[in-house]
Amino acid sequence: MRKPFQFVTAIASALLINSVAALPDRVGDFSLLDSEGDFHQLSRYRHQDALVLMSYDSSCSSIDGALAQFKTMQSAFADQQVSFALINSSLEANIENIRAERARLGADFSLLLDSGQLVSETLSLSKTGELAILDPDRLTIVYRGGIEAAASQVLMDEIQGDVDSTTVMQANGCDIQYPAKRQHTDLVPDYATEIAPIIGEQCASCHREGGIGPFAMDSHLMLQGWSPMIREVLLTKRMPPTQVDPNIGHFSNARYISDSDLQKLVHWIDAGAPKGVAAVDPLTEIQFPDRREWQLGEPDYVITAPKHEVPATGVLDYINVDVDLPFEEDKWVKAVQYIAGDESVLHHLLSYVTAPQEVAEGEAAQGNVATRFLEGYAPGKVDAMTFPENTGVFIPEGHKLSMQFHYTTNGRATSDETILGLYMYDEPPMYENFTQSVSGMFRIPPYEQDYEASARYVFN
């Protein structure tokens, strides 16, 4: 009676093995900025049937011929739901020279900057002029190789939904060098001296017990267990949470992470996230200051916000509340500090000084709006805010504080009762610290892709 069962099991197992083996190679999600600072993420091309990338290096002698073929291929598929882009992973690439290259090419496709080479590594690109045809929905690569008839055929099959494996063909062109990968293959980055310091500097303040991060990065074991997720959010630029172009201006509190540090982290994870030989785990030694202490001493006035119950699950609407202030005279705020009741769920908080009958619209305001914005709270922003010298936020007599709360659930029901400490001037400062909103609410039309919105304000 057991033999038929064993026979059926064997057939089912064989079919399962064959079906798994036939799938295209998964590359996972990733993100890059292009020469104009625009953000490109593979999964955001899911409205397209395919994304075609070609490795590019202007110093390669054969690149012009490959580029001509690439443009021809793009023209052939112009009426299809296919996007084309170049990916520059040259070690000499930087924002200035790829902008110059983009202008010289005059092409209608993007030039992506892969300065850390991690995306090119993930796609296993080895030659300039090499193609990678990607399925943005399944996050797989269906073709890698030269620009030839086979590439066009695979792309046509992908559009029809008929691709069930990855086609790999030989590519001609200049070799792409990966010195960081080679170095880290020979000598894996050390956890204690190289990896843990990056995590401590960039991640641990939020990813700690009781923090807003979904898990604590407080030991090698935790880091190793979450390493696939860490790799993914690094390559998609979700973390560290700095979704701004580092090549335009400078944000003093942005947690930019260097290409070198990214390479160390990703290559360490790819090597299995080894602990090394250090006797002490540096992440277990990190001490955080008491977040419930007043950093500037006892405030002149403490505001206790209404208590909010946060459920274990669900998506919560913003909560807008007004808090009456007891001041019987005008006040000027010199500094402010928030102390979150439960920072593991408080995503952000905004506060405005408003007149008795005024409704603070926050982000819903239309057009240019001038407000007495007091200060905001966001994950990682735990220091007291002292306004610039001789400036302060004005609170006229009889005005109130309008506050907006945004909570994110984390699987555990809790409550939040945040407090604010206000530090006042004894005498009015020379200038009022005023906030000007350049734009308010804008509407994205249904099904609109890559919708752009802009606004301007002229200072008189």
Indicate where each model-derived feature is located.
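Bacterial N-terminal signal peptides
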Residues: 8-18
